[in-house]
Amino acid sequence: MSERFSPEQQQLLALAAVFEAAQLADDVAQRGDCDSQAFEALIAGVMELDADNFDGVYSQPGLLREGVSLLSRSLSKDSRGANLRPLNYGLALLHLAGKLRNNEDTVSILRNRLLALSGQQAHFDRFSDDAFCHRIAGIYLDTLGTFRFRIQVKGEPAHLQDDNKAARIRALFLAGVRAAFLWHQLGGRRWHLLFQRKRLISVIESIDINGLR
């Protein structure tokens, strides 16, 4: 169990990690880059296969502030003028994670591929290395990329056609699905976003966002 956060806060922060991945993917698609520390934290979470609580997957929740902010805006009644792209990506990642949960064969393949990559981590300096991102992106394409449901990414053509940037976006989408799995594991459900908005906003307000480390 996490000693820093209540069960509801853990659940909320796991959901925020989904939207953090969505925001970073949009950043890469639009301007070709994203927050490197937040990127590293999300990809590190992908490699934590057996953790059963938030702290076990994300040791630096302070790097998820953008995700918390994006989630907060999406739950508010007045979201006029908000950038809808990352919101749509986040919801799509939740849907994609649901598709994955219902496909045990693909879950098994995904886990085995990640376990194999985990055994080779020493060959990479950082999770943000282009070579590592391509490995993660390849796993995404060979598993989630085989589903009929696809996430349509909008961005600058020069960035979307760049192999390294495209790999980062796919790696972030896999990170978002991993976060969505944790959210579901902690009791999160998509219908909560429709029918428990006030409760979710209350949980967000109970977290000292600026004090997160």
Curated annotation (Swiss-Prot):
Family from the record: Belongs to the HflD family.
Any one GO cellular component localisation term in the record: cytoplasm
PANTHER family: HIGH FREQUENCY LYSOGENIZATION PROTEIN HFLD
Keyword Iron-sulfur set for record: no
The organism of origin for this protein: Alcanivorax borkumensis (strain ATCC 700651 / DSM 11573 / NCIMB 13689 / SK2)
Membrane topology: Peripheral membrane protein
Record has Flavoprotein as a keyword: no
Highest taxon above the source species: Bacteria
Localization, UniProt: Cytoplasm; Cell inner membrane
InterPro entries reported for this sequence: HflD, HflD-like_sf
Annotated Pfam families: DUF489
Protein name, UniProt field: High frequency lysogenization protein HflD homolog
Keywords of this entry: Cell inner membrane, Cell membrane, Cytoplasm, Membrane
Main location: cytoplasm
